[in-house]
């Protein structure tokens, strides 16, 4: 049985809709999509693209790229993991959004959508590179959102923070993985230094949430 590309496309579109629903759909963004396909016996391969995007033509471009890829060369059971990382950002870097989708194949249960942040560091590094180019000022803030439901977890803003260093916990409150992923944000020289702390005690069977990281002047 060939892997269901229609279902795959629907999940990508759902991810895009979640990102766009957090902001004005009329605003234009640059976009970066990173897709990594890992198989049981064949070597994994990567589909990667970077383009100027907006809500009208981003989705068809990404979906066409997926359908034109080598997905049809594999059967569904060939895959053991599929990772999708999506980053959207305005040309002046004043706003950025990042989201992740991941599928893991379990031989007893089939395909499951896994929503955790284990491999989110690649986009974090890319965000860091963009931040270095941006001219952020004292009004810059970092907001961590829960995808579902979309609620703000915590906000960092240099102008109302007394210390030079503030920790943002990805999973706060009563979430089971509250201490597993953290960001350190340092304010210096009018810019934000975005650093990652490695996830600790990660467990494959735990529940994790989708997140959007938003940078806004």
Summary of predicted features, one role per range:
Residues 153-217:
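Non-catalytic C-terminal interaction segments of nucleic acid-processing enzymes
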């Amino acid at each position: 049985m060939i892997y269901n590309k229609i279902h795959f496309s629907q999940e990508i579109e759902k991810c895009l809709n979640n990102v766009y629903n957090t902001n004005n759909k009329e605003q234009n963004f640059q976009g970066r999509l990173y897709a990594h396909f890992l198989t049981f016996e064949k070597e994994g391969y990567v589909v990667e693209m970077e383009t100027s995007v907006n809500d009208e033509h981003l989705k068809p471009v990404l979906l066409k790229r997926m359908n034109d890829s080598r997905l049809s060369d594999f059967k569904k059971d060939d895959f053991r993991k599929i990772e999708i990382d999506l980053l959207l950002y305005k040309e002046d870097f004043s706003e950025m959004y990042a989201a992740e989708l991941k599928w893991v194949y379990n031989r007893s249960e089939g395909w499951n959508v896994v929503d955790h942040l284990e491999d989110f560091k690649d986009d974090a590094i890319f965000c860091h590179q963009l931040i270095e180019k941006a001219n952020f000022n004292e009004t810059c803030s970092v907001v961590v959102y829960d995808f579902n439901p979309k609620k703000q977890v915590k906000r960092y803003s240099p102008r109302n923070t007394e210390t030079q260093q503030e920790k943002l916990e990805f999973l706060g409150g009563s979430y089971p993985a509250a201490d597993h992923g953290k960001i350190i944000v340092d304010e210096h020289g009018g810019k934000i230094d975005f650093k990652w702390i490695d996830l600790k005690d990660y467990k494959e069977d735990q529940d994790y949430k989708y997140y959007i990281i938003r940078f806004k002047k």
